[in-house]
């Protein structure tokens, strides 16, 4: 009743009580154009019915001849609503049989009784523009009735439908996995659910013109479907991340009504709550930091042996979670006693604007708000970067920035408290530029090649551990142990899920008992100090690592430090001579990028490097290893305007003078002079290229290789050792000796 109080939105508003469903429907008869009937024997028709209801102002009702059913009370009796759409035959028999031609379409059956109703909807509503593809709903169909006790009773999430019906959204309950049949229909062909979902997402992308993002409410209902709980082969979080990876590829995000806490009621009403134009938050000044003993008089971070701590107060990336936990967390009487960085998605303003408004109006000076994962909606931003796996669509970064900016401006946000990368690539330099445009005071991604970096003026800190111990003392011990493991950087981030202010107060008290050098900060102080600290310690000749202000490289030592900042932007400002260079570990050269854990590994070089027309000279390496080269393994990188002279690369396989294995990389105006790349240390066949190792989805343009040697036992090339069909070599030439040891004497001038 908060909003019924004097001065509040619902003060003195009239309330009408209806005693029966018949009375309620009769009262709103002017808004209801009829009924769409669904068939519980084909559970997916229940979701299709909700989608049709929104598109045509109908009520979705289950066909049921029982005298107390809604069908009997509202169609056969009471207001006698007209049946306008049927997902069941008039005689009550099943319409969708999983064979022949799908009724009402020209398409053959998918072979899946579950999927055919969705194809019917695609043909009759999505392709005809009758639905609003800016909204979608991922909620359980009637299959939940087979095991209603799998989790809390209200996780049927029927109460969540009203908002999405009001938005004319499309509905679905489909598996994101392409390596097993959907667990709710094990006889279907593998990948059928996934194919239908991709078709829906692509249509949404096309109708939204790639400019608007699709807002999906819901979450994989892993207690019921698509995981090991339901007889599948995948665990819970992997299923969450695979769905996330999939929708992100098509410019969609989710408002994550996750399992057990996923129910939400009356959002169609609360969406009309009047928000203020702006909810501002102040940023800390350097003078304030000096007064608090955090900065010295000359503006440097005054560490004094301290470790600075921030808690990610989550997970508030779902309207249902924010709504259900307000009374347990926000209304805790101990809120305000310690600094708390509340991570709440601004896109929740769509369904629970009244809750977000209440937070801002009742916040204390110790309550500060940042965006939760991963901005204005939960998606994998690495899937917005080109090339985009799954969809092959153009970059979605610009449209993501345009989606997030107004949300951040409205709510006074400048920090993205956590970026869940999941199964997606980490942010490359273009992804970093995207976030810098709307989250200038900080981001915390899972995947980062170093613990921290400064991108432009944006501090970037790698996410660390989740700390969710029930007992505050146990949590404090875990925090202290982790901080002591991580020597060096005195800034520490920990994620907590649905913890009360009382828990935080008690954790801080326990920390003081164990180690009083640990200092919990408010979010502005933490990220501003981190920014200053990173400026003080950056090992380059200048710059901040962004495209317009790249890190400046003037010595071999600075060039070697690129490996700690692999996602950023660099420019060479003079020639580099590696004749006498020895790395800090006393070893010979090692490539800047490494293979790492495989696809999308953060150990790969994914930055932007502008050689400025200068040269790298006399770099040499001879090791029994793969991907030996200057830059090593690259992915999503760009290297331009560089000369390489008199360099020697001798190793095992995937060798190149400039790069080893080269993924989704652009190389332009790079000249290799009098250098050698030789595969002489391998015990089996391998490859080498005068410029790069094998190319995958990459482009080389206006490059040359002159003089020198290329030698390999398997594949050898004057430019690259090999390339897949998605790569291009444009306006390049090589004049070098290329030796392919089919026979010891074979050699070719290429």
Regions found by a protein language model. Name each.
Residues 1-268:
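Preference for solvent-exposed, low-hydrophobicity sequence contexts
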Residues 24-29, 203-207, 285-308, 329-334, ...:
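Short boundary motifs at domain starts and secondary-structure transition points
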Residues 193-221, 309, 314-322, 327, ...:
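Catalytic grooves of carbohydrate-active enzymes
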Residues 233-303, 310, 538-541, 545, ...:
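N-terminal module-boundary/linker segments of secreted carbohydrate-active enzymes
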Residues 266-360:
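Active-site beta->alpha N-cap acidic-glycine motif
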Residues 345-406, 410:
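Substrate-binding cleft of extracellular glycoside hydrolase catalytic domains
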Residues 361-368, 406-416, 437, 665-666, ...:
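Secondary-structure boundary elements
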Residues 537-741, 750:
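Surface-exposed repetitive/solenoidal architectures
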